[in-house]
Amino acid sequence: KRQALLPYAKTRLDLNYIIGEMIAELACGHAYVNPGEIKGPERIKMGLLGAELNRDKSGFYRIEKILPGAIYSQKLRSPLTEPGLGVKEGDYITAVDGIPTTTVDNIYSLLIGKAGVLTELSINSTPSAKGARQVVVNPIDNEYPLYHYNWVQNNIKKVEEATNGRVGYVYIPDMGPDGLNEFARYFYPQLDKEALIIDDRANGGGNVSPMIIERLLRRPYRLTMSRTSTKVGTIPDATLVGPKVLLINKYSASDGDLFPWSFKANKIGKVIGTRTWGGIVGISGCLLYTSPSPRD
């Protein structure tokens, strides 16, 4: 019945739409078609400073908030926190590459194409061009990783303060390499906590949840202690023996959807939140010679 639409398909996007309609009739998750032979326009990347800015009545821009970054990851680099810059919240940006911000409608018009390009900012502690100093920054093209990182850090801080440091918190963004790395980064330093909150909300899926479940299922059968220490170790190593709970929501998807089921089935702890996405399908697929990739 979709054949009748083919004469009207003039572009690859039209054909992909028809294929998508066919796939929709399967009522199956993880089934879609990738674009194929489509040339997109070249994107001009906007330079971003990892900060929240507000325009002062003077026309200069006040730095309301600087997003902290993390030195262990390039994608968590926050431009205004680079060593030696001395830029603080409350400072003003009076010019970009020598062009006063008072001469433009929006400061970001001066940052078009500046991502990854060394850019000079004029910084002052007052909303005035007089006395401003110049610093050179390297803008980024995406602030989402910084916002996400700070959201996680705020969650850790909330749990720390609410429990007097007794309970740990681990957020797992997906079930791929990034999610596994994040689990390892935050799980192992908190093995001495009395309990653990694992956050699976908005988990983007992947395939490593069995590895995490295996780690959470570990039970010590022997304890160790150094002669001059009061710290107790476990055999097997890296075992957190306290209670655990798992947070979920409707955006916990794919393997991030299977993870809470496995958590509950293995009686690791309570699952708290709203019903998950409900789309657990293993995917594979074959490439067509014209490049689009139907997945099933």
List each language-model region with its residue ranges.
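Conserved small/polar residues in nucleotide/adenosyl-binding loops
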Residues: 289-296
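Extended, small/polar residue-biased N-terminal targeting/export presequences
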Residues: 3-62, 129-155
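PDZ/PDZ-like domain segments forming the peptide/carboxylate-binding groove
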Residues: 43-103, 177
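Amphipathic, well-packed alpha-helical segments that form the structural scaffold of globular domains
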Residues: 20-27, 31, 64-71, 184, ...
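Cleft-lining beta-strand/loop regions that shape enzyme active-site pockets
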Residues: 1, 7, 36, 73-80, ...
